[in-house]
Structures are given as structure tokens and as C-alpha cells.
Curated annotation (Swiss-Prot):
The keyword DNA-binding does not apply. ATP binds at G12, M13, S14, G15, G16, V17, D18, S19, M38, G127. Disulfide bonds join C103-C200. Belongs to the MnmA/TRMU family. It holds the Pfam family tRNA_Me_trans_M. It catalyses: S-sulfanyl-L-cysteinyl-[protein] + uridine(34) in tRNA + AH2 + ATP = 2-thiouridine(34) in tRNA + L-cysteinyl-[protein] + A + AMP + diphosphate + H(+). The record marks H128, Q344 as: Interaction with tRNA. Transmembrane segments: none annotated. It comes from the Bacteria. InterPro entries: MnmA-like, MnmA-like_C, MnmA-like_central, MnmA-like_central_sf, Rossmann-like_a/b/a_fold. Catalyzes the 2-thiolation of uridine at the wobble position (U34) of tRNA, leading to the formation of s(2)U34. PANTHER family: MITOCHONDRIAL TRNA-SPECIFIC 2-THIOURIDYLASE 1, TRNA 5-METHYLAMINOMETHYL-2-THIOURIDYLATE -METHYLTRANSFERASE. It comes from Streptococcus pyogenes serotype M28 (strain MGAS6180). This is tRNA-specific 2-thiouridylase MnmA.
Length: 373
């Protein structure tokens, strides 16, 4: 049996069941485990539900139960500078950001990793549903989590080889139901705690109300592609491409009874475009441009390859051809795709392996830019 007692693993503990079981499994495997709670958001001046204090109590309870030391570290400044400023800038530009991708890249696997090194860590570990596998050359490959419904490689796609070399994902081979069972068997304080939802720093708060505290909403016209005025929108930042709810025009029909969807935005004119039908022609595209292209292991500066891709979390894979030039890529779809959303991540896969990805800049239909922003 391997002696892991001299290998120190610092676990990012959120107060949830996944990170609790992560710490427990590593402790049972004989590692020298330290728990760390990250406080990334100052909730003292906000209305709504925020659970940071309660979450830290849960971390302390679990750490005491399994017999590991634990600390709390404050990354509020790093979070504001590296994640929240990006989040606001994307909304100002009419895009729909993905703060979870940026949070993993900049906070959980950069600021936290750096902090863990000061504690003498050999590795960091989190409760993400993903797997790492080292090949004979020492290169680490990131693989999808065994639980298809929980796989989180989409959100981890911007991690570097250097970060992956220092990372363990102890839950990657487990189903979520098994994780709950392990927690209940061990009697962990978090065994029955419900999973957190929504963007990390917003929690359960009303999104529109939250965003309006930081960005002034500018109302404007809501129109169909052919120029029919459908009323007023509350501010372009509140809508995302392909969105159905929250338009307030459910009773207005243009010749058919199909529901209305957001099909485009004109930032310069402050117009929100809407159309009827889930597969409205304005929502369909056959290629995209992406930037901030990043691979989890070394790749050529310029190359073309075929793979599968996801354009949003929990979406089935789609076949694509990718041409990479530096940190930019053109991605051509084998089949037309719906509601490709600027600001969201495009993530590349080769079977079970997550290769990396980038951020969507523009979607195209037959070579013409889609008027999504």
C-alpha cells in the first residue's frame, strides 16, 4: 500500500457535500490534508440570502469530524479584480459572461493554488466532477467526470498544464448519488445539505436586482427582425440569446402560436430583437469565432483539427472542425447550432478528454455575422 502521509493536499472546502467528501476521501487514503475555506465576496452590504458565515461553520464542523486542520482565506480583492470586473465588462458589451470559468482559472486554481503552496502543499484538491490522468511522459490529461450529469470539465477548460499538474479531483470517478451516500455513511454535517445554485457571488438573490446595483439599466425598444415594435425591454444586459421567459409579450402572436425568444441585440441602437419559435432562423448559425483559446496541454501555435464541442454547460457534444491561430480560433459546425452566445465558453473534447476551449466572440450564418450583439 502506498504511503501518502508525506504528501500534503490542501482542499478547497466550500461547506458543501462535494468538498466535504473530497477531504474525507483524501484523509482516508492517508494524505496529510488541510481544509481551506475561500471567502470571495463581501456580503455585508447586500440584501438577499448569503451563506458565507454558515458555510464556514459547516467547513469547521466537517474538518473537526474528520480530524484535519482548517483555515479561512480572503480573496475578495482578487475576485473583484479578476472575475467581477470581467463579469461587468462583458455585460456592458452586451455579452453573456461565464464567471464560473473565470473563477476556476483565476481564483480556485490560481489565487488558491498560490496560497496552498505557502502551506507546503504538494497538491490542491476540489470537489469538482472531473478526472486527471498522467501519461507515460508525465503530461496530465483532464477527463470528463464519470457522472455525465455532473461533469464540470466545461468550467475547468481554461486550466493550464501547470495547474493540472498540481490538482487532484477525488470525486471524478464517482456518481453524485455515491458522494451523498459516502457523506451519510460517515455522518458528515453536510450530508443532507442541498447543492448551491446560481452564480457564486449572487447566490439565491434576484439577478436583475443584483445587476442593477452595479450597471444602470437602459430601457429600449423590443422589435421583431422585420421591424415590428413589440414594446419596451428593461435593459439589454438582462437578456441572453435564446431566452424565452421574461419578455412580457406572451400574448402577442405574429400569425402563429409559438412562444417568443430573444434572437438578437443591437447594442448601438439599444434594440432587443425577438422572434417566434425555438428554432427561429435568426437563432441558427453554422460557425463561430472565439478568442482566449487555451489548451490544457501543449499544442502547436497554428493547426486544424476535428473534435466535438460544447457551447454551453450540459449540452450534448456537437461535431466541429477547428482552425487555431494563436489565441484565436474559427469553429465550423457539422450541423447548424442554436443560440450560440457571445461571452460563453466553447469547449473542445476528444472522447473523454477535455482539450481546452475559448470564449465565443461572434456566430456566423453562411459567412455572415449573426446580429447577436
Amino acid at each position: 500500500m502506498t504511503d501518502n502521509s508525506k504528501i500534503r493536499v490542501v482542499v478547497g472546502m466550500s461547506g458543501g457535500v462535494d468538498s466535504s467528501v473530497t477531504a474525507l476521501l483524501l484523509k482516508e487514503q492517508g494524505y496529510d490534508v488541510i481544509g481551506v475555506f475561500m471567502k470571495n465576496w463581501d456580503d455585508t452590504d447586500e440584501f438577499g440570502v448569503c451563506t458565507a458565515t454558515e458555510d464556514y461553520k459547516d467547513v469547521a464542523a466537517v474538518a473537526d469530524q474528520i480530524g484535519i486542520p482548517y483555515y479561512s482565506v480572503n480573496f475578495e480583492k482578487e475576485y473583484w479584480d479578476r472575475v467581477f470586473e470581467y463579469f461587468l465588462a462583458e455585460y456592458r458589451a452586451g455579452r453573456t459572461p461565464n464567471p464560473d470559468v473565470m473563477c476556476n482559472k483565476e481564483i480556485k486554481f490560481k489565487a488558491f493554488l498560490d496560497y496552498a503552496m505557502t502551506l507546503g502543499a504538494d497538491y490542491v484538491a476540489t470537489g469538482h466532477y472531473a478526472q486527471v490522468k498522467r501519461d507515460e511522459n508525465g503530461t496530465v490529461h483532464m477527463l470528463r467526470g464519470a457522472d455525465n450529469g455532473k461533469d464540470q470539465t466545461y468550467f475547468l477548460s481554461q486550466l493550464s498544464q501547470e495547474q493540472l499538474q498540481k490538482t487532484l479531483f477525488p470525486l471524478g470517478h464517482l456518481q453524485k448519488s455515491e458522494v451523498r451516500e459516502i457523506a451519510e455513511r460517515a455522518g458528515l454535517a453536510t450530508a443532507k445539505k442541498k447543492d448551491s445554485t446560481g452564480i457564486c457571488f449572487i447566490g439565491e438573490k434576484n439577478f436583475k436586482q443584483f445587476l442593477s446595483q452595479y450597471l444602470p439599466a437602459q430601457k429600449g425598444r423590443m422589435m421583431t427582425i422585420d421591424g415590428r415594435d413589440m414594446g419596451e425591454h428593461a435593459g439589454l444586459m438582462y437578456y441572453t440569446i435564446g431566452q424565452r421567459g421574461g419578455l412580457g409579450i406572451g400574448g402577442q402572436h405574429g400569425g402563429d402560436n409559438q412562444p417568443w425568444f430573444v434572437v438578437g441585440k443591437d447594442l448601438s441602437q439599444n434594440i432587443l430583437y425577438v422572434g417566434q419559435g425555438f428554432y427561429h432562423e435568426a437563432l441558427m448559425s453554422n460557425s463561430l469565432d472565439a478568442s482566449v483559446i487555451h489548451f490544457t496541454r501543449e499544442m502547436p501555435e497554428e493547426f486544424t483539427f476535428e473534435c466535438t464541442a460544447k457551447f454551453r454547460y450540459r449540452q450534448p457534444d456537437s461535431h466541429v472542425a477547428v482552425h487555431v491561430r494563436g489565441d484565436k480560433a474559427e469553429v465550423v459546425f457539422a450541423e447548424p447550432q442554436r443560440a450560440i452566445t457571445p461571452g460563453q465558453a466553447v469547449v473542445f473534447y476528444d472522447g473523454k478528454e477535455c482539450l481546452g476551449g475559448g470564449m465565443i466572440d461572434m456566430a456566423y450564418k453562411n459567412g455572415q455575422p449573426c446580429q447577436y450583439i
